[in-house]
UniProtKB/Swiss-Prot annotation:
Gene3D superfamilies: Cytochrome c-like domain (1.10.760.10). This is Cytochrome c. GO terms for cellular component: mitochondrial intermembrane space. Keywords: Acetylation, Electron transport, Heme, Iron, Metal-binding, Methylation, Mitochondrion, Respiratory chain, Transport. The modification N6,N6,N6-trimethyllysine is found at residues 81, 95. It holds the Pfam family Cytochrom_C. One of its GO terms (molecular function) is metal ion binding. Electron carrier protein. The oxidized form of the cytochrome c heme group can accept an electron from the heme group of the cytochrome c1 subunit of cytochrome reductase. Cytochrome c then transfers this electron to the cytochrome oxidase complex, the final protein carrier in the mitochondrial electron-transport chain. The lineage of its organism: Eukaryota, Viridiplantae, Streptophyta, Embryophyta, Tracheophyta. PANTHER family: CYTOCHROME C. GO terms for biological process: gibberellic acid homeostasis. The keyword Mitochondrion applies. It is found in: Mitochondrion intermembrane space.
Length: 112
């Protein structure tokens, strides 16, 4: 598997479209927005998995204790259930490196 360092440059505008079509039904990014089926992603970068206040995570997510940043998100978004066995996230992943890079570029700007 290629790493984030080898990924194409991400486009946040394209990433926003990906978020709206594949992620927004379960996640929010705005500060203070509530949780949906998945946790609010505001403040995602630098946060440990399974630690967002007010959201009930699976044991797998809590125990993985990964710190979310470009490399970990890039690997996770390829196949969430393989990266964190037992995760509640039902999304099958983004197989295309460009889509993952675009989504990460958007998340870096929208969750800060």
């Amino acid at each position: 598997m290629a790493s984030f360092a080898e990924a194409p440059a991400g486009n946040p505008t394209t990433g926003e479209k990906i978020f709206k079509t594949k992620c927004a039904q379960c996640h929010t990014v705005e500060k203070g927005a509530g949780h949906k089926q998945g946790p609010n992603l505001n403040g995602l970068f630098g946060r440990q998995s399974g630690t967002t206040a007010g959201y009930s995570y699976s044991a797998g997510n809590k125990n993985k204790a990964v710190i979310w940043e470009e490399n970990t998100l890039y690997d996770y978004l390829l196949n969430p259930k393989k990266y964190i066995p037992g995760t509640k996230m039902v999304f099958p992943g983004l197989k295309k490196p460009q889509e993952r890079a675009d989504l990460i570029a958007y998340l870096k700007t929208s969750t800060a």
